[in-house]
């Protein structure tokens, strides 16, 4: 009877595929400003990519596109029969996430394959039709809630199972396979979103990995306080933007190369690299959504656990510089990064360039963008600035001194985190009652086009201000994005020639060496004596 009711609703939905999008479609159907502000304060989330195909160690879902009929049949019919994660203990995941300073979780309730990790009436291709027969989504939400971690869900509008079941060729980024142009798929997806947002209580956020029109409206109507991340705010994938983006945004990145579990041919970022990504993202005003991919038996790979525990130690001492912070007047001075408390003039100076800082060793550095006041106080996060173990003769008080060349900071790391008495991860100095000491420049990327006659890219920018410098250098950078998903950016930026400027205004430069048939992103660059800043990214196709 349940399936009959669902099929009836599906047929009705096919006649009115965007009914929810057209009902009460006023200003209320959007992310609420106060909820986005809350989201920005959280700063650090855990992404969990898990699917039935983790059993064979393939890229999550995508192996279905271009697959043979036999492969698809066995994927849909056989893989669920052997999916039995008997070592699945979400309480352990949640406890580890809590230690690591995670504030919210986003779980892949349904990835592109269409396999549903919850007890759903919308398809037989779901977790209840496996030997496991437990609602994994429900258990994850409950376990993370118990730790005070806000629950979020990922839902893919693309659904390879639905396309296969309806005799359609599996494809990406073509209109006929998208819900917006496919009433039956839209109704199927809308029914799933309604289920997810009515079965499990309040859900703080939902991530639509594809065309969100017609689905985000269902989410906002069902739970008005929900935050739609991808589908409503910027969510760069596998990259941190070169500039702070406007408003709330979220970078989502993997620990290794893959989103799902990879038993072989995987290489991981170090714990230090993961911490650096968190620092850079927060310095630019965004959230970091760091991914794990559980094994088919339900355990986290040991490499992922190790990195979360390294992050946990760093966050145990330094979490104050991550939560409820906003960007400083500039994001960084070389390898020293900044976050500023949202409601006070407290600045966190996150020092990445003093690698392997030995305990008990004084370090001195100068900041150009910060000015002290009479009320300024300095300390190193995590330590009391009074005691160094076994050395009662030392007085490791952090000090600051304002001079003509900048703010001088003298600090000692005194906490013993490792047996070697070396600490490879950032040290954070907290400065209270400080002011900006510079005005940064501003560049805009205005146009990028292919000049067929000259066989080169003609790029145009606008230097809006030099800041407080008499001269700067301007230019452009490019990166190859051919064949990438619009959210995915994994290739490195390639610098172009810089030219000096002593005045504001438009500038045009040519970029040579771009390959025929490729698609590139282009961004303007301005190099100040203290910092390099960027304009927004534009797309350029080379014929």
Which residues make up each language-model segment?
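Mature catalytic domains of secreted/periplasmic carbohydrate-active enzymes
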Residues: 22-440, 530
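Bacterial N-terminal signal peptides
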Residues: 6-15
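Residues in and immediately flanking transmembrane alpha helices
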Residues: 15-16, 298
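Positively charged n-region of N-terminal signal peptides that target proteins for export
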Residues: 1-4, 97
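Sec/Tat signal peptide C-region and signal peptidase I cleavage site
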Residues: 17-21
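Short, surface-exposed linear motifs at loops/turns and structural transition points
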Residues: 437-543
